[in-house]
Amino acid sequence: WPVLFGALLISSLVIAQVPVVTLGPDFSEPGDGWDKLMQLKNGNTVYLHFSKKDGLLVNIYDTARALKVADTVHAQLWNAADLESTEIDGIFEINGQPVIFLQQLVKYNPVMYRLVLDAETGRLLREDKLGELPSVQHRSVFIDDNLATHDMYVEKDTNSDYYAVALFSGAPIQKTDSVRERIRVLHFSPAHELINSGWFYIPDSSYSYFSYINMAVKGKEKVYLGTVGFNAKRKEGDAGAKVLFSMLSPDSATFAHEVLDYTAGFGNIGGNIQVTGAQVRMLLYVSSKQKEGYTGMMMNTFQAATGKLKKQVQLSFPELSRNMQQNLNYKEEYKGTPQRLHLNEDGSSTLLMESFSFFKQGNSQLNKLHTNLGDIGITLLDTAGRENATLAVSKYQVITGVCEPFQLQRRSKSEWVFRNKIAALNTNTWLSYDYIPVPGVSFVLFNDYLQYLDTGGQDKVRKPLKFAADANFVCYRFYNGKMERLFLFGMPEVTKGYACMMGAADYNAQTRMYATVLISRKGQEKKANIAWIKF
């Protein structure tokens, strides 16, 4: 039943380095919503489709890639019929089971639910309400490019199944409010038991409002939280907004804080926290600081046990800029936005970047802002944050809305908000890219607009990929200093194309298996398959 074929358009490559594709059974193109694949430890592949029409659909494929379950999840607490007031905060495998964290507005109050599914049948095993925030109908507190967060977040430990939930209340503080009970973090075991909870506040009240950056979990031992602390009114002796790195320990109901003084006055900060051994890294990105000779990126290293700052390094990428100048005809430095950080056990890392530019188009208030997702820059950094190797790939896509930094990091755990009522504008799942490193070779994957198919190669003005119907999946292979383009599903033609849902994809580094949803077009006909790509 599955179809097997390899990459066809290859010159003299080592056969072991050729990605091999397995296709599951055909099915109809998914409707508007959100899709996610999970390759479970038991060998099954779970395909979740959040449908605006049918609710949450779950399909399960066995190790032979045959469909063995097709069912609908019937939740009691979460209202599947009201998808437009729902956001996905994370989808993880925990304790061998698919676990889905959803947030939904209930009479304007954000409520978080946890759904646990059976790994064999897809049935709903348990559903719990984890928390609730006050109404979203309030004035935002926005000072010097820092917004008081009013939202909930979930992060899972990458090395275990412990996880944490953060609940941020960001409404203007009233006289009757307890300022020490506005932000709470819940620490859970793999069995979904609450093992600790902590209130997040500054004991000396030097900051009243907080903007969430990121969170990380280290087993049952620690929860780390990055925020920006700021005040609505300037207090005497107030140094302005600063980044805080905070730590919750099992023997405490409150956080210990490390204030990063060098971040005084920073605004609109993006970041990512990851744990490796005895160290914790927090990468910060401040777009306003991205100027000539300065990337706006700072790598901070903390002691995992104490949460104290060990060192702080400003990252720079001269080799990547040289690569861009030599191969993509750049005249100046590459100014990429960080999209995802892969931290290795030894402290070295891989940073995935993408060039962003923003523009306004049209009269609609909802869909006026757009983001160009441009060239790909990837740099492999040593333990000190210096470049070891770089990759540069030309790409041009456009998306409705403003794309934020670390979007690929969030997409990897399926963070998604169902806000766009126009299905044609929901192109996020097709855009940006993926990076697959294996020993001796690496691959960059994305959907491209191959306009030479339309023009016979005459079109000299590059057009961006804007609509899913124009997408064609390409795989760039980097080997021995050379770059080659592969078409894994066959050569695209004017009337024939192959596109993959990047947002639905799941990569298992142990098995080197990449699972995604493939949409094949032949004339006016379309069909979908789960595609497993072995790298």
Give the positions of each predicted feature.
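Conserved blade-ending motifs and adjacent loop-strand segments that build the rim/top face
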Residues: H257-G271, Q314-E333, E387-Y433, D470-N472, ...
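Bacterial Sec-dependent N-terminal signal peptides
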Residues: W1-V21
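Blade-loop segments of beta-propeller domains
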Residues: D26-S28, A66-N109, K129-N146, G198-I213, ...
